[in-house]
Amino acid sequence: MKFIETLKNVWKITELKDRIMLTLGLLLVYRFGAQVVLPGIDASQLGSLASNTDSGILGLLNAFTGGAFAKASVFALGIMPYISASIVVQLMGIAIPYLQKLQKEGASGQKKITQITRWLTIGICLVQAPAYLASLPALMGGTQAFMLGQSGVFYFSSVIILVTGCIFAMWLGEKITDKGVGNGISLLIMVGIIATMPLSFAQEFDSAVSQSQGGLIKILIEIVIWFAIILASVMLVMAVRRIAVQYARRTASGSYEKNIMGSRQYIPLKLNASGVMPIIFAQAIMFVPGLIGGLDILKDSTVGQWLVANFGGNSMFGLWYNIVFGLLIIVFTYFYTAITVPTNKMADDLKRSGGFIPGIRPGTETSEYLDKIMSQITLPGSVFLALIAVFPAIIVQIMDIQMGWALFFGGTSLLIMVGVAIDTMQQINSYLLNKHYDGLMKTGKNRKLA
């Protein structure tokens, strides 16, 4: 009953209600666009495209786009070009002084970085759109799916539409972030993944029931394992290391002032401070080796064949793919944590507010101490994150599970769903608490103030 009362409180806050409605509206627009087939494509021929993109790397890419990839939709590129552009810009920020300067300029610098990311997104789209169109005949089993034929007009117009679709999806994500609730880009990916989940489960259910007498028991075991992985993912996202902080309280007595010890508070340092971004970044990079191996200049060479065999098609359940994937997640976790947890700023803010960590001097020593703690908790956090990410490959080896359904047993799909859902709930929770209502994620009683 308390949860229902909390949901009612959400609609009592006008600003929060408007933000939620805007978010839902923009997500519906995105889902509608994912169903619109490119002009010139015969929709009746899309069955073979869907069957060739229901598992492996293409299956994951299709999940990221909410099924738009398999529908030859105007949103077939999804939001991944924007993610790729963000990765490139952040990596370049390490080596390029101009970008380093922008990162230190606060809001104005971030605005310029966003503009650079947008232009780079367009450039990536101009490369990916022709590649996607060129791959359609093979993915459709060689059928003549183009109603207008494979003419130059079709290719030119389709490239323009695909690039525009990606830009529009990017705009939707930014609007959700600015005017809605949650991180817009992550929400678009999460909604796309959720949209493909029922079909994957239905295929697994049909396969399990039709092939063995213990099919229902197998499905129940899979569901139990699935919920256990969700629980582990939630624990990873929510786990924090609390650092005690003491504040000096200044009081006046006669002609002099003195400091007395104030109340003790805590700085919550998250075990996984980088959230789901290392997973998204690593997954975006894992699409690259297979594409490189398939280039004309490499596809007949030993290197090209090895890249395609280990990083293309259904290789995402293979050994080399998951070793590289796990290592990339660990590296990106450290990289993104360094960006999102500014220990220098935390130490300066603590010093200015009269706070200090017991036994640690304010200023530089505090910053170094926080850096040390973050390094200690980021290692197990990143390893745990990597283990959950590669778990689909493990469960495929242990149990006879459909590859499309296995993607939801940990891995990128589940971690994105859990991480984004918790992040969105926390943002809604902060709105409720600021207005003195019980939060969605708060267990204690928090009465509304008059």
Residue ranges and their predicted role:
Residues M1-Q103, S108-A450:
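N-terminal cationic and glycine-rich segments that engage phosphates or anionic surfaces
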